[in-house]
Amino acid sequence: MGKQKADYLLRSDHIFTSTVENPFAGYVAVSGQNILAVGTDDGSDWIDEQTEVLELGDQLVTPGFIDVHTFFTGYAIFHIGIDMSGITSQEEFLQKIKEQVEKEKEPSTVFGHGWNPNGFETEGLEEKLNEAYSDRAVIVFAADRSTCMMNRKAEEAYGFNPKECYPEAYHKIMPEYLNDRDFIEPEFKDYMKLMNSRGVTTVKEMGFDDFYGFDSFLKEKEEKKELSLRTFFMSQPVGEGINIEHGKRMREKFQGDFVRFSGYNRMTDGTVASTKGDLLEPYEGTNMHCSIQVDYPMIEKEVQLADENGFRYSLHAQGDGAVHKVAGIFDKCQKKDGKLVNRHAVTDMEFSNPADLKKMGEIGVTGEIYFQIMSLDPADDVKKSIEETIGTERGKYFWNRRGMLDGGMTLSGATDLPLMI
């Protein structure tokens, strides 16, 4: 029997395997879902009359990227319900709502997206929604999800308001749209297409609590071989505490190549700029270490429970105080030969102490980093914020990616999609 031939042969002047430092000219031979060979010649030994040869020239060929923190559930909010972009008056806004209500056979929450809060004067609009729809919830999200317009019925039903319009606050609406097949089927297909178009083939996906039934959707798509995005999903306790039994069920349910349960995820503190970051030393000119309360004992209990049951835990920590406490929590977890048995991770690490980075490197904590986050705000604004909150001396440890690597940590890249898209 002769050597197996390729279904596809990709030739490029720039092939990056990630196992060598620089790209090189050559080929990649592919059969089915398997890479047969990678080489620096023309790959002709792998070709027969059935092989499709792709001459890619200057185009880069690289392994698929892994995005270690994505949030499809939040991405979908950009497209939920009525498209309210382009609305320029309260009259248009109310007319759109009215038209949607008249279309629906059964009374349900009216959702909308794309609203521009600065597009027209909104004073009195909430009262008009209350009068017109006293028995029906109405929620229209701003184009950037920073706020929303909603009536009293919606606030009562879902337990949040326009001043607290963020995913953890509006988690009660998620079961509705995640189980709306007419909406979620095309939405997830577009999401996979978007990620694939950026070279992403695998994601670590955030799902609140028990994912509100969305795991059944993923299972169905996996069995039908309709997934182009490998999905390792996590449970983030929001409406309830850690649900270990759910994790056990998901671990048993997903054993294939495309979907797996990856463990648990939780926030600790907030950003340093907002003074919600937990600091080892007080904020400049104050006696305050953190403007919010963080329940570290509860977090430690959850991490220990997850660790005992063979699950990993990702903790978000932004201030150096939070990073220090997270390092201490992980240091108490199971180890073998000095390294963590379960691959726990710390996310973001906006501001950190080099000693804690070294400690985490020694025990094998992975860093999940939003590498693009430095591009969100103008450089001068960031510098000013650092000077005002922690000062220039401590500021040299802000976004200390070099220190993380020098400390021995393995770093992975995340977009926190939809934040970075």
Residue ranges and their predicted role:
Residues 4-11, 16, 20-246, 271-318, ...:
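Divalent metal-binding segments
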Residues 71, 256-276, 365-375:
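Non-cysteine beta-strand/loop elements that form the S-adenosyl-L-methionine
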Residues 78-85, 340-343, 348, 379-393, ...:
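Short beta-alpha connecting loops at secondary-structure transitions
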Residues 152, 214-216, 323-331, 377-384, ...:
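Histidine/acidic-residue-rich catalytic or RNA/ligand-binding cores of hydrolases
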Residues 221-224, 250-256, 339, 360-362:
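Acidic (Asp/Glu)-rich catalytic clusters
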Residues 228-262, 343-350, 389-409:
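Phosphate/diphosphate-binding loops
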Residues 272-275, 311-321, 368-371, 404-421:
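Short acidic/histidine-rich active-site segments
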Residues 280-282, 365-404, 421:
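Flexible glycine/proline-rich, aromatic-decorated loop/lid segments
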